[in-house]
Structure formats: structure tokens, C-alpha cells
Amino acid sequence: MNATQLTQVWTSTQVHQAALPEAEAVNAEILAGFAGLTPEDYRYRSHFIAGRFENLYLERTRLPGIERVLIHAEGCARAILGHPGPLRCGFWLNVMEAGHTTSEHTHEENDELLSGVYYVAAPPVSGDLVLRDGPLLVRLTPSPGTFLFFPPDLPHWVESNRSPGLRLSIGMNFGPLE
């Protein structure tokens, strides 16, 4: 699926889904690079909740394969937003071991136009993404190689990773170039 073949998965809040071409190979490259990262590789960590940092920030050059994910994500974001030019893309890793959750939050801190997530590793029962639209809740089960895009002001969280494996995703925000 490419940027022009986006699927809207929940029409009331404009949540879109897309897939990364050759995701299996890209994800393997990212996971191999991730295994070699040290705390010094992260330029910033945020949201220390329940004993872990929920967001880990690093430079694109520190993780092989991530550039392909971000380039494809930006193409999808431009298609969703109807924005022909380049966008600013901020990104971070969300690393969830067994028992970890990610707390409810939004991404509307600055001038974000669209938020997204890409799943690198998501074993069965590793935690659904839960979206809150007023009284409605929607649970989306992550799948490696899948992107989900949604409004930055949409409250969301990740349920507990009940698998014994690692759940690794890349969070993203897109906004205008300054």
C-alpha cells in the first residue's frame, strides 16, 4: 500500500491506515539496530511514568532503516493532509516490554497537523492502541509494518503488553516547515 492507497479505518475521527513496502526487511534492520543502541544514543527521553520513559528520542542516523519509515510516513501524511510540499516530522521510539503500558495523552503541544505511529514489532496481545472520541472508545490491534495516522488532539493510550516479547513502535508528529 502506498501513500495514495490509504485506508480510513474509522471515519468519525479520520484515522487512516497504510502499510510500508518491504516492511519485513525494514523492520528486521530496525530491530537489529535497536538491539545495539545504548543510553548514550538517545538525545532525550520523556514521560517517565510507571518506571520507564515512554518516549525515546534519537537522531535519524542512529537507527538503520528508520529513514525509510519516515520518508514513507511523510508521503502518507502529505496525502492525508492534501499538503503537496514537505512537512516537518518529529519522531520517537516507544519501547514496551512485558507489562508496560503507555498512558493516555494527546499530541497537540505545538503546531502539529497529524500524528502517527508505525509498528516495528508487535507480538500478539502486546497492547492495543485505544482512541477516545468523547464517550466512544476504539481499540486497534497493532501489526508490524502498519502505519496509523490520526488527529493530534485525539486522546489515546496503549494497553498493557501481555506478551513476553518486545513491542516497538515509532511515534510521529507532522507539522508545517518553519
Where are these regions (language model features)?
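Short non-domain terminal segments
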Residues: 46, 51, 147-148, 172
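Catalytic core of non-heme Fe(II) oxygenases with the double-stranded beta-helix
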Residues: 82-159, 166-169, 175
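Non-heme Fe(II)/2-oxoglutarate
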Residues: 1-84
